[in-house]
Every structure is written in structure tokens, then in C-alpha cells.
Design a protein with these regions (language model features):
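Terminal, non-catalytic protein-protein interaction segments that mediate quaternary/complex assembly
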Residues: 1-182
Length: 183
């Protein structure tokens, strides 16, 4: 399956009004257990490169405050919805993958693939067991969406296998795709 197949699924579900109602009462369309090749940077719409650059810079800063995403304006509504009243979140992917607090997973992945290019151990775990007690702290609603990413080199090409708990096809996918390209 490729991005075009995912797109067609969502178009068909929308046309046939096959919705799941989320906790806010909003109609959503789900595709549970999808496995596909991310061969396009967007499922719907066009990536906003200016915003992507800001989000990646924020990830690299390892700040867990959404007010640091866009110094010139408001953070995106989705981040505001997920954040505490103080702007704190759990899902800064740079913090989760590069900070010593989380064992500098990126460094370990690079070392592993440098030492053993055929390895299947080059994994980064984004989510964590403690998220059950952290996701709603101080008014947050941020249960990390990416569970884990495995990296492999095959035929001199880096392959990422991304396992998501949840991913928004309109906004989230574009930014997650860009993050994996940066990684």
C-alpha cells in the first residue's frame, strides 16, 4: 500500500459517511492498523515548509513548551489543545530522541548503523509506560502519537519503519514525514 491507497480510503469513507465520533463529538475517519509506504510528503494538502522548519527547529531545541514553536505568533491549535495551561507537552520528538534524559536514542541509532549497517536494533522508542500518568497532567491531552521507529540500511538506502498510535492525515502526517526525512 502507498499514500495514494490511504488517500482513496479516506475519500471513500468520507463519501460514504463512515465516521467514528471522537471524545469531543467530532466526526473522524479511521484506518486502523494501516501499513503503507510513505512515498509522498502529503496525504491531503500541501506541506507548509515554513511551519515544518519551525517545528523541526523546536524539536531540535528539545523544549517541551509549545510557546517556543513560533516566536512570532501563536502555536498551532492542535498543539494548544494538547498542551497544559502553561504550554507544556510530552511530544517534543527531539527531546524524546536526542536528550540524555531519554538516553540519546538518536546517537545510539547512528552508532549502531555505523558499526553494523545490517542491524535490526537501530530503534527509537518515543512513547513510554509512564505516559499513562503524564498525558493529562495540568490539563494536558498529550498521549504521544509515535510509538517507535526502527531504522535499517538495505541496499545502501536508509529505511524507517514508523509505528504510530494515531496520526492525523491532514496535518500530522506531513509534519511527521518531514521529521523522518530530517532524521
Amino acid at each position: 500500500m502507498k499514500v495514494s491507497d490511504i488517500r482513496e480510503h479516506f475519500i471513500s469513507e468520507l463519501k460514504n459517511e463512515k465516521f467514528t465520533i471522537d471524545k469531543t463529538g467530532a466526526k473522524t475517519i479511521e484506518l486502523i492498523g494501516a501499513s503503507f509506504t510513505a512515498d509522498e510528503p502529503s496525504i491531503f494538502g500541501t506541506p507548509n515548509q515554513e511551519y515544518i522548519d519551525k517545528e523541526i527547529a523546536w524539536y531540535k531545541s528539545m523544549s517541551n513548551n509549545i510557546n517556543d514553536i513560533n516566536k512570532d505568533g501563536e502555536p498551532p491549535a492542535a498543539w494548544k489543545y494538547a498542551a497544559s495551561e502553561y504550554g507544556q507537552i510530552n511530544s517534543n520528538y527531539g527531546l524524546l530522541t536526542m536528550a540524555d534524559e531519554y538516553y540519546n536514542q538518536l546517537g545510539h541509532v547512528v552508532d549502531e548503523l555505523t558499526t553494523n549497517p545490517d542491524s535490526r536494533r537501530a530503534c527509537m522508542i518515543y512513547n513510554r509506560p509512564s505516559i499513562w500518568t503524564e498525558y493529562d497532567k495540568n490539563g494536558m491531552s498529550d498521549f504521544i502519537c509515535t510509538n517507535a521507529v526502527s531504522y535499517m540500511i538495505r541496499n545502501d538506502k536508509l529505511i524507517s519503519v514508523v509505528q504510530m498510535r494515531s496520526n492525523d492525515v491532514v496535518y500530522g502526517y506531513k509534519n511527521d514525514y518531514a521529521w523522518q526525512r530530517w532524521m
